[in-house]
Every structure is written in C-alpha cells, then in structure tokens.
Regions:
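Alpha-helical transmembrane segments and their immediate juxtamembrane cytosolic regions
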Residues: 1-346
Length: 346
C-alpha cells in the first residue's frame, strides 16, 4: 500500500510539471514567469525518473525505454510529415515544396534538436519539445550501463558527475544528434533522484533545513537572473544555475509530497502524470498542427490571449489523452479476451 501511495504522489508531481511545461510554452520568451518555470521543470522530470529508476539488464530495459520514449518520438514525427505533405499540397501544390518539408522534418526528427541550427549542425531545424524524449532515452541507457557495471554507490556517483562534465564540455562545441550531450549532462540529475530515495521525506528535522538551503540557492540564482534551458545547454551562472535547478526541483517534489491527496485536482494530476510522455506528444501535435495564431489572433504577450490559449491547449490535451487511454484499454481487453479464447480452443 505504501508503494502505491509513493507512486501516486510522484505521478501527481509529474502531472503538475507537465501542466507547467504547456503553460511555459504558452508564455512569451522574455516572460518572468517562464523564466521561473524553466529553472526547474525539465530538471525535475529527470530527477523524478532517477527516483523511480531500478537497475535492470540493458537487454531488458533498452527495448522498454525505446518503446516508451523513441516510439512516440518517431510516431509524432511521422504524423508531422504527413500533416506537412497535406498542408503544402493544398497551399502550393509544388512537389519541390513537399520534398523540402519532408526532408527538413525527417532530418529534424532524426536529430531531435530542441532548437534551430544546433552547434556543429547548423543545417538542422528544431524538432521542438520532443528533444526531451531522445535525451531521456540516452540518459537512461547511460544510467543502466553505469549501474550495471559499477556496484559501489561512490563510483556510480562519480561516473554520473563525470558524465555531466563530459556532456558540458562537448556541448561547448557540438550539440550532438539525439541530444546525447544533454543525456550526459543530466546524469547528475538522475543520480540525485536515485539518491533521494535514501532520504526520509517525512522527517521534518531533515527536510525543513534542506528546503531552506534549496530556497536560498534558488533565490540567489533568481536574483542574479541565472537562466536555465536544457535544450539550449544554457546555465548562465554555471555552477549556481545547475545547483539552483536541483534546488528548485527539490522544492517542487517536496511540495508535491506534502500536498499529496489534500488537493482537489489530485486525480487529474495523477492521470496526467501517469501519461506524461503521451501528454508531451499531444502538446507537440497541437503546437505544430493547430493554427493557434489564426484561431487566436492578436498580441502574443496579451494576458487574456495567453490564458485562453493555455485553456484551449489543456482541453485539447486532456480530451485527446482520455480518448487515447480508453482506446488502449479497449484494445488490451480485446487482446486478452482473444488470447484466452485461443488457449481454450487448443
């Protein structure tokens, strides 16, 4: 029962962070609120993944991560290619334009860059927020390799920290395909999440001082305008900003633990958290395929427009997610029923 509760509050935390991801992408680039959200939202997702990580042989965990992370990435990319073929066909009808957009989108999907013209590959275009799926896949592969071959915790910690340093050094010159350099950078986040399992989050004598330290670190970074954007490999005050991203993540994770089951939106947040990768894909789809600028014309910085756009995006994602989960459940039930019937007929 305790395990189920633990997973529930983690799902709730993931769900809250995914809502912030959508909201952060709705805000304008120079928004102060966006700056605050970006100091912790993606690092927190990596830390949570480290928290729930269980070392398994790569031959079993590798296919699982590929199915959970790469399959959605390539499915979304294929859908975007089809969408762009149809759109360009009706807009210009020129085969040269269709070939251009198919080639551009296919290359973007293979690189999975979160920004346009990544360092060392200036001819590559962005694939948007799904950079996270590629980075997470390789990060989990690296983490499995480290944990399978290093048995001492001190060695594991050292290797993860070394991976972060190597990733930062590489990213100074090259932003690698599939965000492999980011995957190395976030190894420290993953290990911090793994280490967090050793801390009693219900022990106030430990958590209150820890939270105070986290608030101070995050507050100093905020006061000094230390920006954090993983897709851009940006830590404007290197050590402080990296520490602040961990501190901010700790604050959000601990807050989720405290308010677990005490808030009215507990179940919806858990639902979103359990399907966080699907939510990210749906967010990618609506960002690229729904003409929000046509539906909601006007100043992108308008508070009214931001709120309405965020509400519409959230509704689309929740409705689509509900339909998707119902279809999956129906398929699984039918598959199990057919399996039982086949066994009986043997």
């Amino acid at each position: 029962m305790e395990k189920a509760k633990r997973l529930d509050w983690i799902d709730m935390c993931r769900g809250f962070i995914m809502i912030l991801v959508v909201f952060g992408h709705t805000l304008t680039y120079n928004s102060n609120l966006r700056f605050i959200i970006f100091t912790f939202h993606m690092p927190a997702l990596f830390i949570i993944s480290g928290y729930v990580f269980k070392p398994r042989p790569l031959k079993t965990s590798g296919p699982k991560y590929a199915k959970r992370l790469l399959l959605p990435l390539y499915a979304a990319g294929t859908a975007l290619i089809v969408y762009r073929i149809i759109r360009v066909y009706f807009e210009t009808g020129r085969m040269s334009d269709i070939i251009y957009w198919v080639k551009r989108t296919f290359i973007a999907m293979l690189f999975a860059s979160g920004t346009d013209t990544p360092k060392g590959f200036t001819w590559v275009h962005t694939f948007g927020m799904l950079w996270f799926l590629a980075a997470m896949f390789w990060a989990m592969i690296f983490l499995c390799l480290i944990f399978n071959h290093a048995k001492k915790e001190s060695v594991r910690a050292l290797l993860c920290f070394a991976g972060t340093i190597i990733g930062i050094v590489i990213s100074k010159k090259y932003w690698l395909p599939m965000n492999i350099d980011i995957a190395l950078i976030v190894l420290t986040y993953l290990y911090v999440g793994h280490f967090l399992k050793n801390i009693d989050l219900d022990n106030k004598k430990i958590m209150i001082p820890l939270m105070l330290v986290c608030i101070v670190i995050w507050g100093i970074n905020y006061a000094l305008v230390g920006k954090i954007e993983l897709a851009q490999r940006k830590f404007t005050i290197p050590l402080l900003s990296f520490a602040a991203s961990i501190a901010g993540s700790f604050i959000v994770i601990y807050a989720a633990k405290l308010v677990y089951r005490d808030i009215k939106v507990y179940n919806p947040l858990c639902f979103i958290g359990r399907n966080s990768m699907t939510v990210l894909v749906l967010h990618f789809i609506e960002s690229n395929m729904i003409p929000w600028n046509v539906i909601l014309p006007g100043n992108p910085a308008s508070k009214k427009r931001i709120i309405i756009l965020f509400i519409l995006r959230t509704i689309f994602i929740l409705v689509s997610l509900t339909v998707w989960t119902k279809v999956k459940e129906a398929y699984k039930k039918r598959h199990l029923k057919i399996g039982k019937e086949n066994k009986l007929s043997v």
